[in-house]
């Protein structure tokens, strides 16, 4: 009799555990979708998205990727530029977070050689990927990547005092505007006190694509050949930074 009572008590508990795990899996997957789908990622800064919104944006995004009637000509170029916009936005967000981590958690100083090498490597990759890749958009102004030092603005006041700002002059223009509704990342510090060694020519011409080049080629193949196999993305690799 006591064994039966124990079994009855265990049943609802195990059911609750199963339900909790199921909800956790759903929430985890929705969270990943919110970070993966470009439209959802761009709206994260404006507040928390509802689950239904994330699912709707995911459906729209997948329909656009699988559509056999992809727009051609200028419309196609604008679509590719939009994909590149989201990549650049995410890239600069990652750079901002890395800089904040290095200066606040690791307590690195901006004159630290290792810190300067990391920033130089990331900025060199950003410059390589920011070149216009879409000829139909050639009428837009070329971005200026002459990185010049300037004081940090008020938007960066919440970070550590050592994080002085540096960004391309005239960064508001160029072929890659910030996604609508997304807050621009604060400027990044770059104050090396010594010459910064960059990657060697052999490393810069490595067989691996830079992230932006891989992204552009992926979507060019996707639009040219609307086929499920075109959705295979390979993680880009780079030579070690340090």
Curated annotation (Swiss-Prot):
Pfam families: Hairy_orange (PF07527), HLH (PF00010). GO terms for biological process: central nervous system development; GABAergic neuron differentiation in basal ganglia; multicellular organism growth; positive regulation of transcription by RNA polymerase II; post-embryonic development; regulation of neurogenesis; suckling behavior; transcription by RNA polymerase II. Residues 87-122 form the Orange domain. Coiled coil: none annotated. GO terms for molecular function: DNA-binding transcription factor activity, RNA polymerase II-specific; DNA-binding transcription repressor activity, RNA polymerase II-specific; identical protein binding; protein dimerization activity; RNA polymerase II cis-regulatory region sequence-specific DNA binding. It comes from the Eukaryota. The keyword Nuclease does not apply. The modification N6-acetyllysine is found at residue 48. It is found in: Nucleus. GO terms for cellular component: chromatin; nucleus; transcription regulator complex. Keywords: Acetylation, DNA-binding, Nucleus, Repressor, Transcription, Transcription regulation. Residues 10-65 form the bHLH domain. InterPro entries: bHLH_dom, HES_HEY, HLH_DNA-bd_sf, Orange_dom. Belongs to the HEY family. Transcriptional repressor which binds preferentially to the canonical E box sequence 5'-CACGCG-3'. Self-associates. Interacts with HES5 and HEY2. PANTHER family: BASIC HELIX-LOOP-HELIX TRANSCRIPTION FACTOR, HES-RELATED. This is Hairy and enhancer of split-related protein HELT. It comes from Homo sapiens (Human).
């Amino acid at each position: 009799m006591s064994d039966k009572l124990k079994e009855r008590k265990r049943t609802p508990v195990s059911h609750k555990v199963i339900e909790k795990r199921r909800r956790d899996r759903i929430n985890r997957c929705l969270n990943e979708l919110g970070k993966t789908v470009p439209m959802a990622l761009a709206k994260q800064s404006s507040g928390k998205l509802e689950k239904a919104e994330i699912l709707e944006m995911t459906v729209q995004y997948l329909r656009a990727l699988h559509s056999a009637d992809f727009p051609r000509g200028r419309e196609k170029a604008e679509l590719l530029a939009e994909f590149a916009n989201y990549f650049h936005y995410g890239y600069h967000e990652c750079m901002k977070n890395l800089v904040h981590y290095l200066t606040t958690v690791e307590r690195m100083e901006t004159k630290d050689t290792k810190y300067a090498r990391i920033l130089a490597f990331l900025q060199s990759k950003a410059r390589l990927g920011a070149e216009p890749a879409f000829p139909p958009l050639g009428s837009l102004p070329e971005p200026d990547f002459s990185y010049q030092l300037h004081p940090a603005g008020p938007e960066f006041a919440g970070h550590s005092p050592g994080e002085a700002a540096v960004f391309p002059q005239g960064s508001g223009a160029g072929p890659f505007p910030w996604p609508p509704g997304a807050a621009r990342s604060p400027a990044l510090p770059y104050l090396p006190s010594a010459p910064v060694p960059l990657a060697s020519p052999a490393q810069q011409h490595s067989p691996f694509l830079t992230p932006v080049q891989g992204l552009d080629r992926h979507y060019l193949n996707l639009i040219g050949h609307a086929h499920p196999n075109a959705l295979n993305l390979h993680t880009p690799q780079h030579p070690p930074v340090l």
